[in-house]
Design a protein with these regions (language model features):
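Beta-strand signatures of extracellular beta-sandwich domains
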Residues: 54-58
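N-terminal edge beta-strand
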Residues: 17-42, 47, 152
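Short aromatic-acidic-glycine turn motif
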Residues: 59-72
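Extracytoplasmic/periplasmic copper-protein system
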Residues: 121-157
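Proline-anchored loop/turn motifs at beta-strand termini and strand-loop-strand connectors
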Residues: 28, 60-62, 94-100
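Fungal secretory targeting signals
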Residues: 1-24, 157
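Internal, hydrophobic beta-strand segments that form the core of beta-sheet-rich folds
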Residues: 90-136
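A beta-strand/beta-hairpin structural motif
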Residues: 72-101
């Protein structure tokens, strides 16, 4: 009985050390202007603690896109904080609406995540993007996932 109690206590303390990181985004390939739509935030187990602070979302026509920018139109933001930081399961955030003055057709959707990494809380920004089509209504029947971020790190020396 003592072994079982020790084992359970050890597993509980290991579970409290569980950490996760955000690994990408999934969103509809066809997004309606003037509509709020859902973006799934992908996550997985990770070896260290990460304090995920907030997401910002933007769109831009591909021919005007610059690496590292959100685009010409800021279309949403989401504070994550302790509720969604270090969460091992995927979760959904509402985004939008994308204004109707954004040209319909092929558009680059960008998501920037500001996080603090490790025991020294090193600030880092991750940016994921996906090419989507802007149209009259959102269609959830097809989605696109982006899992390779552009990363901007600052590590104190």
């Amino acid at each position: 009985m003592k072994f079982a109690t020790t084992l359970v206590t050890g597993l509980v303390s290991l579970a409290s050390l569980a950490s996760a990181r955000i690994t990408g985004i999934t969103l509809p390939t066809k997004i309606g202007v003037n509509e709020v739509f859902n973006v799934t935030i992908k996550s997985e187990n990770y070896i260290q603690s990460i304090a995920d602070i907030a997401f910002a979302f933007g769109v831009i026509q591909p021919q005007y896109a610059d690496a590292g920018s959100l685009g010409m139109y800021l279309v949403g933001e989401s504070f994550l904080g302790p509720t969604f930081s270090n969460q091992i399961s995927d979760f959904i955030v509402p985004v939008g609406p994308i204004p109707d003055n954004v040209p319909k057709g092929e558009t680059l959707f960008n998501a920037a995540l500001f996080s603090l990494l490790g025991s020294r809380f090193a600030p880092t920004t991750f940016i994921w993007n996906a090419t989507v089509t802007l149209q009259n209504t959102t269609d959830y029947s097809q989605t696109i996932t982006s899992t390779i971020p552009l990363t901007f790190d600052y590590y104190p020396g």
